[in-house]
Amino acid sequence: MRTISKALILLAAAFLSSAVDSEACTNVLVTKGASTDGSNMVSYAADSHQLYGELYYAPAGVWIAGDMRQINEWDTGKFLGYIPQPARTYQRVGNMNEHQLIIAETTYGGRPELEGNNGIMDYGSLIYVALERAKTAREAIKVIVDLANTYGYYSSGESFSIADTEEVWVMDLIGKGKDEKGIVWVARRVPDGYICAHANQARISTFPLNDPEN
């Protein structure tokens, strides 16, 4: 009986260990036209008992020339570098800031040779720095692209869910590999009245080349 119990405990421990390491995030995006109260919504869940046990808080700030922000990899806490602070940053709690801008993500990985390793902006830092610097979803997309292309990308392929009080967007991005800095990316607006979801798969499969507004 003891042998069986030990085997079951070891099996459970192995299962839990593999579950923590696996990519198991889910985002559900609801536009205001599809919600009963007229609100845009984004949910962010991960199948892990170790994730999202706390809400990250950063107060609003006013900065002067020369002030720097430290960048640590979100998953590991590894120090990656510093970037200059803008003149002002916004308060954020969890994955929302004071302007009701929301950014969440799921990791799809992508081709391993495109994984970014020559920059300092990992996917978590892109999320939280964008929340500190942007008021709207469109501004957040621009901030993310500018940060990744300026300071380099340090993660694998990601799908970001980005929403404000008016619009909901999905953004897929991936690095350019070890020899190039920056990201390849595409973003699409979720039409009002629709619901969208993604779970560790690149979400955007087709997109128009002549419709930058959507």
Residue ranges and their predicted role:
Residues 1-7:
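Positively charged n-region of N-terminal signal peptides that target proteins for export
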Residues 2, 17, 153-157:
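Intrinsically disordered or highly flexible coil/loop and linker segments, enriched in small
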Residues 7-18:
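Bacterial N-terminal signal peptides
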Residues 18-24:
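Sec/Tat signal peptide C-region and signal peptidase I cleavage site
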Residues 25-123, 143-214:
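A contiguous strand-loop segment
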Residues 115-116, 125-134:
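Second-shell loop/turn segments in exported
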